[in-house]
A protein has these predicted regions:
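Extended, charged low-complexity regulatory segments
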Residues: 1-202, 207-211, 545-546
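Alpha-helical structural signal
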Residues: 2, 47, 51, 79, ...
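P-loop NTPase Walker
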Residues: 2-19, 23-51, 55, 179-181, ...
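Hydrophobic alpha-helical scaffolding
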Residues: 191, 254, 258, 298-308, ...
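Conserved helicase motor core of SF1/SF2 NTP-dependent helicases
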Residues: 248, 253, 262-306, 494, ...
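ATP-hydrolysis module of ASCE/P-loop NTPase motor domains
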Residues: 297-385
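A residue-level signal for conserved active-site and pocket-lining positions in enzyme catalytic cores
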Residues: 315, 490, 643
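Conserved helicase NTPase catalytic core signature
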Residues: 344-572, 581-585
Length: 753
C-alpha cells in the first residue's frame, strides 16, 4: 500500500490586481524585499564587527573582566549566526492595517535607521514571533485584529537577490474569509515535496497552531493531535517563540527537546537553527543517561516494570546494598598497633554516614572519617599504656618525638599522650593502603552502569532490592531504552565520583582558549561564502596567545555546555511522542527542568510503548498532580483524506473514543494494495519501490521522499531507500510509503498503523 502527496505548486495571483498593475505591484514588493536584504546585510556586518572588536580587546587583569569580554564576543557571534540564518525567505508577508499603516513580516526583526516606514516608526520588518505580527496568523473576517489585508509572498531566487515571484491576498473587509484552512498559500506549502529534513512553517502557521505557539512560558501544556496536525512543528516553533520572548532567561538555561529516535532528531534538528535559535539540546529517551546510547528494547513486561516509579525504591535499595558490612573482621596493621574493622565498627560508621543524608559518593567521605575515628579510638585503647604513670607517659612522649618534655610530666600528661597518639594514628591510617582498601570494599566508588548491571544480573541482588525477578538478564547485556532513566536515577543517587587530580592551570587555560576559538570558527563557518577575504578569529589569535588572557573555565554556547553536563537544569522542556514515555522517563526529565515549564506533544491513539501513557493523567499525575493543561489540534494539514480514511477505519476498531483529525485536502489518488505469496514478498517490495521511485523522478532528482515501513526490515532485500519499523518511523514524513504486511503490524499493535 502506498500514499502519495500531490507535489504540484499552485500559481498564486491576487484576483484584484491584473496585468500590468499586478506586475507593478509585484515589482514594488520585490524592491521592498531588496531593501530589507540590504538592512539585514548592514546589521549582520555591524554585529560581526562588534564580535571581532570585542574579541580583539585586551581586557584588564581581573578574571571577571576577561570572562565578560569572552561572553560578549560569543553573544555577538551568535547574533551574527541568527541574522544569517534569516537570509533565505527573509520576508514572507505583509499586513495592511485599518489606520493605513503597512507592516512586513519575516524571519527576524529589522529596524530602519532612517525611519522611513509608512507607519512612521523604524520597524522595517517584524519578527514573526513579535506580538505585532500575530494578526498575520490569526486575523480572520470575523476577528480582523485591525487588519484589512494580509498578503502572502511566494519567494524565488536566493539571498540576497530574492524576488517576489507571486503574492496572494486575504482581504478581511470583504464577505470572503480567505484565511481558512483552504488558503492557497497553505495548500501550496502542503503539496510541496518533502525533503530529508523538516522545514519550518513560519509562512503558513494556522490560527489554532499560533494560539498554542504563543502560550505563556510557565506550566505544562500537552498538545494532542492526530497524524498530520503539525504537532511537532508547533512545538518547535513554540520553542523559537519562547526563546524570542524570554531571551534573557532561556538564553542562560536553554531548552531540551526529546524525540522518539535518533532518526527523528536528525529529521527535525535543522528547524530551530533555520529560525536562528541555537540554545537547544536534542536527545532521545535512550540517551537520558549521560554517555549512554541505548537502542535495544526490552520485552513488554520487562519494559513496563522498568518504567514504573516503583523502580525508584528498588534503585535506592540497590545503592544501599553496596554500603556493606564485613563478613569477618578486616585487619589493618599500623606501625605500633593492629586494629580491626568488625561488623559493629563498620555498622556504626555506616550509620553516621547515612545520617548525613548525602548521596553515596558524598557520604563516602563521612564514612571514611567516621571509620577512621573509630579505629583511632580502638588503637589508642589497644596500645595499653599506663597513662597515670608519669615516667611511662614521658617515655611514650619521647617515642612520639616530644622528648623535650623529659621526666617533668604533670597531671595533664595523660590527655596529651592520648591526643598525640590520636594524631599519629590518624596520620598512619591516612597513609595506610589497608585502610583505604577497607573503605573501598565497604563503601566503594561506583558507576551507574556497574550498579545496574550487577543488580540485573544477580538474583540475590534483585531479591535484596525488592525487584521483580523477571528483570534478571545476563551479565554485560546491551543497555535498553528502558535502562536509560534507571541509569540516570542511579547517577543521581550516587552523585559525582571523587574528582581526579586537576589538570595544570596552563593546560586548562590552553584547552579553554582552544574551545573559544573553535566556537567562534564554527560560527564563522555558518557565514562562509559571503566574503572570502573576511578575517576570522583564528586569523589573528592562536590558542596559546588567547590562553594567556583567559579565565581557566569553559566558554561555549549554552547548548554545548548543557549537552556535556548531566546536572544541567533547563528553562523549558519539549517532549515529542510523549505518549510513549514511561513514568520513569518523566521523573528524570522533570528533574532536568525544575521550573516545570514543559510542552508535551503526543497522540494517545498512537501509543505503542508498553510503559507509555494510557491517559495523560495516568502518566502525568504521579509527577505533576493536576498542574497541567491540554490543547488539541483538530485539522490534518499533511495527510490526504484518502490515506486518513484508511487510518480512521483502523482507529474506529481499536480506539473508537478517539476522533481522527479532518484532512484539508484530497489528492484524487486512492491507496493500492497487493497480496502476494509469502515467498514472493521481498521481490514484490523491491518492485514496488522501483515503481513508486520512478513516479517521483530519477533517483538523483526526485521530487519527494520514498520509504518502506515493515515489521521486520531484516527480512527484506537491500533497498536503495530507508527501511523503517513502525517505531523508528514515528514522527517522520514521506511523500510515498510502501507499507509491508500491515496485518502483521496491526496484530502486534494497532496503534503502529
Amino acid at each position: 500500500m502506498q500514499a502519495e502527496n500531490d507535489s504540484t505548486v499552485l500559481h498564486l495571483q491576487d484576483n484584484t490586481a491584473a496585468g500590468a498593475s499586478y506586475e507593478r505591484e509585484r515589482d514594488a514588493e520585490t524592491a521592498v524585499l531588496h531593501r530589507l536584504h540590504a538592512l539585514l546585510a548592514a546589521e549582520t556586518a555591524a554585529a560581526s564587527d562588534r564580535a571581532r572588536g570585542v574579541l580583539a580587546e585586551r581586557a584588564g587583569g581581573e578574571l571577571s573582566a576577561r570572562w565578560e569580554r569572552d561572553v560578549s564576543a560569543h553573544r555577538w557571534s551568535e547574533r551574527v549566526s541568527a541574522l544569517r540564518a534569516a537570509r533565505s525567505g527573509l520576508c514572507f508577508g505583509r499586513l495592511d492595517h485599518t489606520d493605513g499603516a503597512t507592516s512586513y513580516v519575516g524571519r527576524t526583526g529589522l529596524t530602519d535607521p532612517d525611519g522611513t516606514d509608512s507607519d512612521g516608526t523604524d520597524s522595517a520588518l517584524l519578527d514573526w514571533r513579535a506580538p505585532a505580527a500575530r494578526p498575520f496568523y490569526c486575523a480572520t473576517l470575523a476577528t480582523p485584529l485591525g487588519v484589512v489585508r494580509r498578503r502572502h509572498f511566494e519567494i524565488a531566487g536566493t539571498a540576497p537577490a530574492e524576488r517576489v515571484a507571486d503574492f496572494h491576498d486575504d482581504v478581511l473587509d470583504s464577505h470572503t474569509d480567505t484565511g481558512s484552512a483552504s488558503d492557497p498559500a497553505l495548500l501550496a506549502a502542503l503539496r510541496a515535496p518533502r525533503g530529508s529534513t523538516m522545514r519550518d512553517i513560519v509562512t503558513t502557521i494556522q490560527a489554532e497552531q499560533d494560539e498554542i505557539i504563543r502560550l505563556p512560558l510557565p506550566g505544562v501544556v500537552v498538545i494532542e493531535g492526530g497524524p498530520g496536525t503539525g504537532k511537532t512543528a508547533v512545538a518547535l516553533h513554540r520553542v523559537a517563540y519562547l526563546l524570542y520572548t524570554h531571551r534573557e532567561r532561556l538564553a542562560r538555561s536553554g531548552v531540551l527537546v526529546v524525540g522518539p529516535s535518533a532518526g527523528f532528531v536528525s529529521y527535525v534538528g535543522g528547524v530551530l537553527p533555520a529560525l536562528g535559535e541555537s540554545a537547544v539540546v536534542f536527545t532521545t529517551p535512550g540517551r537520558l543517561a549521560h554517555g549512554v546510547v541505548a537502542t535495544a528494547l526490552d520485552p513488554e513486561e520487562v519494559a513496563r516494570t522498568k518504567g514504573s516509579l516503583a523502580m525508584l525504591e528498588v534503585l535506592r535499595r540497590a545503592v544501599a546494598d553496596r554500603q556493606e558490612l564485613p563478613a569477618s573482621p578486616i585487619t589493618i596493621e599500623l606501625d605500633d598497633v593492629i586494629v580491626e574493622v568488625d561488623r559493629a565498627t563498620a555498622a556504626q560508621a555506616r550509620s553516621r554516614a547515612r545520617d548525613t543524608g548525602a548521596v553515596h559518593h558524598a557520604a563516602r567521605a563521612a564514612f571514611r572519617d567516621a571509620l577512621g575515628a573509630l579505629l583511632v579510638g580502638q588503637g589508642v585503647e589497644r596500645l595499653g599504656a599506663d597513662l597515670e604513670d608519669p615516667p611511662e607517659i614521658a617515655a611514650i612522649l619521647r617515642e612520639l618525638e616530644q622528648g623535650e618534655l623529659g621526666e617533668e610530666v604533670g597531671p595533664s600528661g595523660a590527655a596529651q599522650v592520648t591526643e598525640e597518639l590520636r594524631r599519629e594514628l590518624r596520620d598512619d591510617l591516612r597513609r595506610d593502603s589497608g585502610f583505604h582498601d577497607a573503605v573501598e570494599r565497604l563503601w566503594p566508588v561506583l558507576t551507574p552502569e556497574r550498579v545496574l548491571d550487577d543488580l540485573l544480573s544477580s538474583p540475590e541482588r534483585l531479591a535484596s532490592a525488592g525487584a521483580d525477578p523477571a528483570l534478571l538478564r545476563s551479565v554485560g547485556a546491551a543497555w535498553t531504552v528502558a535502562d536509560a532513566p534507571l541509569l540516570d536515577e542511579l547517577a543521581e543517587l550516587l552523585g559525582p565520583p571523587p574528582a581526579p587530580p586537576a589538570a595544570s592551570t596552563d593546560d586548562a587555560e590552553r584547552a579553554y582558549a582552544a574551545e573559544v576559538l573553535a566556537i567562534l570558527e564554527s560560527a564563522d563557518r555558518d557565514l562562509a561564502g559571503e566574503d572570502p577575504d573576511e578575517l576570522r578569529p583564528t586569523d589573528f589569535v592562536t590558542a596559546d596567545v588567547l590562553a594567556a588572557r583567559q579565565v581557566p573555565g569553559r566558554l561555549a554556547g549554552v547548548a554545548e555546555r548543557a549537552a556535556g553536563d548531566r546536572e544541567w537544569r533547563y528553562g523549558h522542556l519539549v517532549v515529542d511522542e510523549a505518549q510513549e514515555l514511561s513514568a520513569m522517563d518523566w521523573h528524570v526529565l522533570l528533574r532536568r527542568c525544575p521550573t516545570r515549564s514543559v510542552t508535551a506533544v503526543g497522540d494517545l491513539a498512537q501509543r505503542s510503548a508498553p510503559a507509555g501513557a494510557g491517559t495523560w493523567a495516568e502518566v502525568l499525575a504521579p509527577v505533576l498532580g493536576d498542574r497541567w493543561a491540554r490543547r488539541s489540534l483538530t485539522v490534518n494539514y499533511r495527510t490526504p483524506a484518502e490515506i486518513m480514511a484508511l487510518a480512521a477505519a483502523v482507529l474506529a476498531q481499536y480506539a473508537p473514543e478517539h476522533r481522527p483529525p479532518a484532512s484539508v485536502r484530497e489528492t484524487g489518488e486512492q491507496p493500492w494494495e497487493r497480496t502476494v505469496p509469502a515467498d514472493g514478498l521481498a521481490a514484490a517490495v523491491a518492485a514496488a519501490v522501483d515503481e513508486e521511485g520512478a513516479r517521483l523522478g530519477p533517483r538523483d532528482r526526485r521530487r519527494g521522499t520514498l520509504a518502506v515501513i515493515a515489521p521486520d526490515p531484516a527480512a527484506l532485500p537491500p533497498l536503495p531507500i530507508p527501511v523503517h519499523t513502525p517505531v523508528s518511523a514515528k514522527g517522520l514524513e514521506f511523500d510515498v510509503v510502501v507499507l509491508v504486511d500491515p496485518e502483521r503490524i496491526r496484530a502486534h499493535h494497532p496503534a503502529d498503523l
